Structure formats: structure tokens, C-alpha cells
Amino acid sequence: MGKITFYEDRGFQGRHYECSTDHSNLQPYFSRCNSVRVDSGCWMLYEQPNFTGCQYFLRRGDYPDYQQWMGFSDSVRSCRLIPHSSSHRIRIYEREDYRGQMVEITDDCPHLQDRFHFSDFHSFHVMEGYWVLYEMPNYRGRQYLLRPGEYRRYHDWGAMNARVGSLRRIMDFY
């Protein structure tokens, strides 16, 4: 069970809303989000309703302003609690529709291009666990939640291009 609290103002001030489950539309509860406290669980925040727009991965901790979670603005319109997973396995492919070279990963990878020498990553098959895909190396840039399932092309995980720099397992030890 997870618990997250959204605050309208920085520094955990102003109107707040406590949440313990997925919400496809947070707009009725607050107009802006400038700070967040994650008491338990791992969460993906979305800039738009229905789990769309920019995504931000948060684990247990305090985030006194939106820049602390690499947010571009104070807009948080939906959230998803990420289930705990004890094992992680993902296959990454050089081309769309699982074509080209394939590599299977079971651990975090801060620099995919250096490790595997692919110039692009066009499809993924998440066999086990939940992962965060980052646009740039060293877990920077836009973030995308990968749940168990198939991602045949970059549009399937919500990206505008096939730029992938790093990949991290979602693990909650708290």
C-alpha cells in the first residue's frame, strides 16, 4: 500500500490532498502541485489527466518543490502507484517490432549506448518488473514508466523519438 500527499504550495504548504491509489484525474482535488511527500511506495506522476504527458518517478521522500522531481511545471493531473516487484527482466531491441539486435537486462543501466553499442532503441519487451526509461544517460531527461508488456515502437511508451539513455528498475525497499 502506498501513500502520497500533494501540496499546492512549495515547502508542503497550502491545500493538500492525500492519495493511496491510482488516480486518472487529480484536477478536482488541487489546482497546482508545488511539493509532494511520499510516505510509502513508488509513484509515477503525470502532467496530464489519464496518465499522459510528462512523467515523473518518485520514491519515498520529501520533494519541497517540483524541480526536486525534475518537473517542468507545477502541473500534476494524474498518478499511478507502482506495484512492488522482486524480479526484473527486460529485452531491448535495436529496431521496431522486436527486430535487429536484442539484449536482455536484469539490472540498472546508467548508459545504454556505452554498454550495448546501439545508436537507437526502438522496442522493448518487459518480461518482469517495472522500469523507468530515461531519455538521457545517468538517469536524466524525460522519464517513461515501462510496465510488464510489449512496446513495439517508441510511441507505445509515450515518447516522441527513440532516444533512450538509461534504464532503471523500480525497487522499493521501504
UniProtKB/Swiss-Prot annotation:
Organs and tissues of expression: Detected in the superior olivary complex and fibers of the ventral aoustic stria of the auditory hindbrain.
Domain Beta/gamma crystallin 'Greek key': 2-40, 41-83, 88-128, 129-171
Gene Ontology BP term (one): visual perception
A family per Pfam: Crystall
Region Connecting peptide, residue ranges: 84-87
Entry keyword set: Eye lens protein, Repeat
Recorded GO MF terms: structural constituent of eye lens
Assigned protein family: Belongs to the beta/gamma-crystallin family.
Domain notes: Has a two-domain beta-structure, folded into four very similar Greek key motifs.
Task of the protein: Crystallins are the dominant structural components of the vertebrate eye lens.
The protein, known as: Gamma-crystallin E
SUPFAM superfamilies named among the record's database cross-references: gamma-Crystallin-like
Further details from the record: There are six different gamma crystallins identified in rat lens.
SMART domains: XTALbg
Organism of provenance: Rattus norvegicus
